[in-house]
Amino acid sequence: MPAAAQPSWWRLELEPPGELEESLLWRLESLGVHRLAVRFRPEAPEQRTLQAWLPEVDWPEPERVALAEALAQMAEPFGVALPSLRWELQPEEDWALSWKRHWQPDPVGQRLLILPAWLQVPAEHAERLALLIDPGSAFGTGSHPTTRLCLEALEKRSLTGSRVADLGCGSGILGIASLVLGAREVLASDTDSLAVRATAENAALNQAGAHLQVQLGSADVLQQLLAGAPADLLLCNILAPVLTALTPAFSELLTARGEGLLSGLLVDQAPALTAHLEAHGWRVTTEAEQGRWALLAIQRA
């Protein structure tokens, strides 16, 4: 009796516009695509390739066409065209190797290390603080410049004993990093149920579940989690239009002397967002930039 044929996988590739990368990852996850990676060379971090692996049996041509249409519709509000999608069939063993091979230990800043959960800390990074992440969650794995900007900003701050609010938590990596760096407690929320699940799972991987609470919702839910005791630090790594819409809620989430770290915005969006924040009573500084992306720090004026 002949051996059963090995299943094959579609490998999907595209070069995402920077402002679309995180949203594409989220949309693919919501459409049932759970094996994702973002490839880039350290010397050229802006040249990025998004890759996804899909079981051939589950994704015949009509399903792949529908997927492309859904991604194109998602790109329309951003005013950019979705790049062409490239499809290639891979045998089972090639897929298994390809997916995990693209995730390697990733040092960030001076002290942090993003570590895929199945790997050990390399000897050369033994002194770094490891953040265990399941890249299959597709949310904020740390490769995106805005996530790295936030992580680098966190390690510059004294977080010992602080209370942190993470609005739009994605994978939970920023909240987990806050705990690793000394925060006492993290309260987190996201409007995507997949992100809430990813945050909870990644917190468990890092044995941080007892100090990180996450719920489905936006600023109102986060305010409820804070239970009348505002945070010392607010993290919000979301697109600029969402930051604009959420600005009125920031004063309810932070103590009088608290600080917010806002990213997810492009450098050329920073002036308008800064003016908007200042009009709502915030003192704003552009703390850092990486490529086309910016990080703003806010405190009450």
Swiss-Prot record:
Subcellular location: Cytoplasm
EC numbers: 2.1.1.-
Positions of S-adenosyl-L-methionine binding: T147, G168, D190, N237
GO MF entries: protein-lysine N-methyltransferase activity
Pfam families, per the entry: PrmA
Catalytic activity: L-lysyl-[protein] + 3 S-adenosyl-L-methionine = N(6),N(6),N(6)-trimethyl-L-lysyl-[protein] + 3 S-adenosyl-L-homocysteine + 3 H(+)
HAMAP family documented for this protein: Methyltr_PrmA (MF_00735)
Job description of the protein: Methylates ribosomal protein L11.
Family: Belongs to the methyltransferase superfamily. PrmA family.
Official protein name in the record: Ribosomal protein L11 methyltransferase
Species assigned in the record: Synechococcus sp. (strain RCC307)
